[in-house]
């Protein structure tokens, strides 16, 4: 999600499509070999530095991203204590997309990504649909894009196995993952309430 928004804000329409349809099949991008070598199925440095930096194959137009007044918030989960971390647009820099790496580090498939010495996992664990965060930040109209029908109730069973594995190294993040289903369902319910209110 966060990487898609960077391209959108930079007005590089079609950029993400290239990542999903061309680069994603490269073994440097994501592969079992990468997982065996460095415990990361997805090579976040390859995706968000090698390809995306100014001298990369498909660079982010950082000047356009920075000039666009559109707000930008990225969610990550602190791997050590399970807390939610919100990063802002000012946390992105020229050839510095570390917050995208942190927010894309899927537990078990990837090691947590450290920023300023703090390891982070994908924000979908801690705040999968940050509707309340958007309201708290003062937005009165919110668009929620779901990958499943809005009446689908998320179940815990898909997260039990990964949470058991994660508990060995990051028990607090594992607890967040184990309860993600409830957080997701609560936030969808909240979004529906706001929808009924015309927000």
Over which residues does each language-model region extend?
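C-terminal helical/tail subdomains of lipid-metabolizing enzymes
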Residues: 188-199
């Amino acid at each position: 999600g966060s990487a898609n928004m960077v391209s959108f804000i930079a007005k590089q329409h079609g950029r993400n499509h290239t990542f999903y349809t061309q680069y994603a099949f490269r073994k440097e991008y994501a592969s079992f070999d990468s997982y065996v070598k460095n415990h990361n199925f997805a090579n976040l440095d390859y995706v968000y530095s090698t390809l995306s930096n100014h001298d990369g194959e498909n660079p982010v137009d950082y000047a356009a991203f920075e000039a666009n007044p559109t707000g930008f918030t990225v969610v990550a989960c602190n791997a050590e204590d399970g807390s939610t971390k919100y990063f802002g647009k000012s946390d992105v820099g020229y050839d510095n997309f570390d917050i995208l790496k942190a927010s894309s580090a899927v537990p078990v498939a990837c090691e947590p990504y450290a920023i300023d010495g703090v390891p982070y996992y994908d924000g979908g664990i801690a705040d999968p649909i940050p509707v309340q965060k958007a309201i708290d930040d003062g937005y009165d109209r919110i668009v929620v894009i779901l990958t499943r029908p809005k009446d689908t109730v998320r179940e815990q069973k898909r997260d039990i196995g990964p949470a058991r594995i994660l508990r060995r190294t990051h028990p607090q993040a594992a607890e967040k993952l184990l309860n993600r289903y409830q957080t997701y369902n609560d936030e969808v319910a909240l979004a529906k309430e706001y929808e009924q209110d015309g927000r």
